[in-house]
Amino acid sequence: GIEMLRETGLLERIMPELLEGYGVEQKLFHHDDVYHHLLNTCDVAPDNIKLAALFHDIGKPRTDMHNGHFYGHDTEGEKITREIMQRLKFPNAEIDRVARLVRNHMFFFPYTEDGMSQEQIDVINEKAWTDSAVRRFIARVGEENVDDLFALRIADASANPKTAFQPKEVEELQKRISEVRAKDMVIKVTDLVINGEDLMSIGFVAGPQIGIVLNELLELVLDDPMLNTREKLLEIASQKIIK
């Protein structure tokens, strides 16, 4: 369908951003140009992530270093994705879901395998994700989007015979996430034991500062879940009251 739109000239009117990838070589770990890789990934992706698959590398033409690297294409891709979907009048929730998948599809999770030397294992262990890193990953992606992100990563690899990606990376990260999920996990503001009313009870005035402070508290709790008690959070928050 997308290719037919291109051949008839309609794609330029509907999603000209996709055409930017036509003929843009990826070298290194890709066989197709950006445009055809996006179409191929969309073809193999499950229905619920086809849009994310179609857009996941859409930022590459604007970040092309002309040496096979596209630094920041995930961030640029998120921006373009939001622009396209807003223009096409998608619901805000769907725009945010797809944009998050595009923004985070380049994750890298280090893991060890049998047969590795001790030196290799030591290097990987130095890069191991802490519980805090896992919580931040989930918070960034959205807990409800994690499985879709894994499906996107697998579709991306399936559409590219030259990929260096190994499915075990997803399997190992899934295990790590399960370990963290089994603990008391705080990944969003509503998981905190206090809310805006609690902040107002100690002197905060209703307004933007409440949201700002709650997000600052969340950042602290992502690093140290032991801080997620009413007493500790209110003590920290009390130091942020604007007199």
What residue spans do the PLM features occupy?
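Conserved, hydrophobic alpha-helical core segments of structured domains
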Residues: 1-165
